[in-house]
């Protein structure tokens, strides 16, 4: 039978128009990593070409490495193969067809010439994606880190999303910094099989429910959209179909039908820089078998996972069939958002290590929930906990909703895709990504010990720190606490507004080591002593819960405010023994129960600091210093002199002290002892009072303009407004 000549077309730079026909003996040229398409014409008719004819090409690269690449039936008498390689040089191929008697398909030989890539598309310039060496992130083949910021477009191959709309949405997401689109090419979620909603401009993808008869025209239209994403530098994460009970692709087509479908997807899109998501809301032995078939069929070894109900890793029966753990953490509002991070951390802790990322969480605007503050919380909370990336979603966009047709069997939202495209969360996540990309973010590791509970921290020791402080409520301007700053490493700090992207400079910060000792313990003559022996308590007055003298102790319960009445002065030093299992405080400059200084140790925070109480309000902790493990009995020494006050603590083995801090209460008052609310009971002993005279020490680092993070703890200035903030500390070169 007459056979037409072999036609070849190179999809250089993803131009949709093919190159002109090339003679069979010639080798077409394609640039590295860019697909080349080769078309074969069958020499004889085949009654069921998609079901009965399998065509593969065995390519051998210049190094002699063979690679089996599946081809796909393109309609009529045509079969096509798409091939790409990072290896420069001449690649030879030979066809291998199940119809061995068809000389147009079987035993054909040829070659492709791969030349260096000269374009600017990062997906081609840096090469295919892979798991990074740290097993926590993704990178290109050349080692360039890949930041996964995904968007959810489950149904955007359907005809409700017009070609013009697809281009508009792609341009918007590219401009905002998105790098991945999760898109279904198979049975859709939230609709029945073979409904009209499934169609694109060329109809449905299959003509039979077992996927034995394909509609090549459908995939021709889909090709243009997949190619357009890649041309924009966006990786298509292709979902092979949905697996939930009400829209179960496995039940629809059977495992053999799903396997045929996946071979077809690999043949069409394997040469592109794609990611495989085997099934949506899928799992169990059958989907694991499909994932194994994908692994064995795909010659390019693309990254693969499952979109799960909860965790991809826990959804498969063999972890070897996936490369990373994709999570779905649930929809809703703040309860779902705050619950997402513990779920992420649990997945991150599983061994052996693999990249973990949230692939579905609270869609923005979904049933009128999960607006931008929720989106920012999940983004920053997961990224600073070790995530390989995040996939965002917006109402309207994921289901390709248009006015009058939301594209859903059960309507969650009537939001159109244009409205969802403009939700502010997508812009704000893009701003966060751009900030992280200004630093070696792929080397960041989570460091929760760098900040207080409720905030998130990550970075590189002695180089850069990121701290995300979620919104604490209205009228709360308190900034986060930075802990464990390295000794003598100068940092530059700034607040980053994750909403607007504005920066607020905080200047330089340094940990010069332990704070200089603010005063010498008991360096003045005694004015008063009390060892609490006997029952005479006439020198004292209880302004809180009653105190009791017994066996050399002054004991009190929560709310204890016991004041020495007879001595009034502004510059005094008090030393007293106490137990370390409850709060212990020394009162200075007491004027009333609502107006005094207190220098205290608290076992709940394991820290010492001062409060300048005024008008019944405590104000911010002053001079807070962490205290290591200490013995059961401690001695506190507190002093106030002029505009400064400080506290020293010792257990006989080790000593800790605050810096001298400036206080607003500078007038003469009385002294006493204190237990507010931590611990059931405190027993004070050996009370000593003397005059005090000291000033803040002059010694310090050469960089006198830097904020002092004594002993490694930095209490940041108030945030510019009560919302969530990102604090960045970047080390300064000498």
List PLM regions with ranges:
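Carbohydrate-binding surfaces in secreted/extracellular proteins
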Residues: 236, 532, 574-576, 629-660
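Active-site mouth of glycoside hydrolases
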Residues: 117, 122-324, 328-335
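Secretory/extracellular carbohydrate-interaction modules
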Residues: 555-614
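Short, aromatic/His-centered strand-loop micro-motif at the edge of beta-sheets
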Residues: 614-635
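Extended acidic/polar, glycine-enriched regions
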Residues: 58, 65-133
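Extracellular glycoside hydrolase catalytic/binding regions
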Residues: 260, 274, 279-419
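Flexible glycan-contacting loops in extracellular carbohydrate-active proteins
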Residues: 657-683, 697-713, 718-720, 728
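Aromatic- and carboxylate-lined catalytic core of secreted/periplasmic carbohydrate-active enzymes
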Residues: 26-30, 45, 352, 363-366, ...
């Amino acid at each position: 039978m007459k056979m037409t000549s072999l036609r070849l077309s190179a999809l250089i730079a993803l131009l949709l128009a093919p190159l002109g026909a090339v003679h069979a003996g010639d080798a077409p040229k394609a640039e590295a990593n860019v697909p080349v398409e080769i078309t074969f014409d069958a020499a004889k008719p085949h009654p069921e070409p998609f079901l009965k004819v399998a065509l593969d090409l065995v390519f051998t690269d210049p190094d002699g490495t063979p690679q089996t690449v599946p081809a796909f039936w393109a309609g009529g008498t045509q079969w096509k193969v798409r091939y790409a390689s990072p290896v420069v040089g001449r690649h030879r191929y030979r066809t291998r067809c199940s119809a061995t008697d068809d000389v147009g398909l079987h035993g054909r030989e040829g070659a492709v010439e791969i030349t260096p890539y000269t374009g600017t598309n990062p997906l081609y310039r840096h090469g295919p994606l892979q798991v990074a060496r740290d097993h926590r992130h993704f990178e290109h083949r050349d080692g360039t880190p890949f930041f996964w910021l995904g968007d959810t477009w489950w149904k955007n191959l359907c005809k409700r999303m017009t070609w013009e709309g697809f281009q508009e949405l792609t341009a918007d997401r590219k401009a905002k910094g998105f790098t991945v689109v999760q898109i279904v090419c198979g049975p859709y979620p939230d609709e029945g099989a073979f409904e009209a909603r499934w169609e694109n401009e060329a109809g449905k993808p299959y003509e039979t429910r077992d996927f034995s008869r394909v509609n090549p025209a459908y995939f021709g239209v889909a090709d243009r959209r997949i190619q357009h994403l890649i041309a924009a530098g966006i990786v298509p994460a292709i979902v092979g179909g949905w697996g939930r009970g009400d829209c179960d692709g496995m039940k629809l087509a059977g495992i053999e039908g799903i396997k045929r479908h996946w071979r077809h997807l690999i043949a069409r899109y394997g040469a592109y820089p794609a990611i495989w998501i085997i099934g949506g809301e899928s799992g169990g032995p059958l989907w694991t078998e499909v994932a194994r078939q994908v692994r064995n069929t795909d010659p390019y070894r693309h990254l693969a996972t499952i979109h799960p109900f909860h965790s991809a890793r826990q959804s498969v029966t063999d972890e070897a069939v996936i490369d990373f753990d994709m999570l779905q953490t649930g929809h809703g509002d703040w309860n779902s958002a705050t619950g997402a991070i513990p779920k992420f951390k649990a997945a991150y802790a599983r061994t052996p290590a693999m990249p973990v990322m949230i692939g579905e969480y609270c869609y923005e605007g979904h049933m009128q929930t999960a607006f931008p503050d929720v989106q920012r919380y999940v983004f920053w909370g997961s990224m600073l906990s070790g995530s390989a990336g995040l996939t965002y979603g917006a109402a309207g966009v994921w289901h390709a909703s248009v006015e009058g047709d939301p594209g859903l069997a059960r309507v969650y939202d009537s939001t159109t895709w244009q409205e969802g495209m403009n939700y502010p969360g997508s812009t704000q996540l893009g701003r966060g990504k751009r900030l992280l990309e200004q630093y070696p973010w792929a080397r960041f590791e989570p460091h929760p010990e760098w900040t207080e509970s409720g905030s998130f921290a990550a970075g590189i020791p002695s180089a850069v720190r990121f701290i995300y402080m979620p919104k604490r409520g209205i009228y709360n301007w308190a900034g986060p606490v930075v802990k464990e700053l390295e000794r003598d490493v100068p940092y530059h700090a700034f607040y980053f507004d994750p909403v607007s992207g504005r920066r607020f400079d905080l200047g330089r910060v340094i940990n010069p080591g332990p704070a200089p000792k603010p005063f010498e313990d008991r360096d003045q003559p005694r004015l008063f002593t009390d060892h609490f022996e006997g029952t005479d308590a006439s020198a004292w007055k209880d302004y809180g819960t009653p105190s009791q003298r017994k066996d050399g102790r002054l004991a009190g319960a929560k709310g204890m405010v016991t004041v020495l009445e007879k001595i009034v002065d502004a510059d005094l030093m008090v030393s007293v023994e106490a137990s370390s299992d409850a709060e212990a405080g020394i009162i200075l400059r007491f004027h009333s129960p609502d107006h005094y200084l207190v220098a205290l140790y608290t076992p709940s925070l394991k820290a010492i600091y001062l409060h300048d109480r005024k008008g019944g309000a405590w104000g911010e902790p002053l001079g807070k210093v962490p205290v290591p493990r200490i013995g059961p009995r401690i001695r506190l020494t507190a002093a106030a002199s002029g505009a400064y006050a400080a506290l020293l603590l010792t257990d006989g083995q080790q000593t800790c002290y605050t810096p001298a801090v400036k206080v607003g209460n500078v007038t003469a008052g009385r002294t006493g002892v204190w237990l507010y609310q931590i611990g059931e009971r405190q027993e004070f002993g050996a009370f000593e009072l003397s005059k005090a005279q000291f000033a803040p020490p002059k010694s310090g680092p050469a960089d006198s303009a830097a904020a002092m993070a004594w002993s490694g703890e930095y209490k940041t200035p108030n945030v510019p407004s009560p919302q969530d903030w990102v604090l960045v500390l970047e080390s300064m070169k000498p």
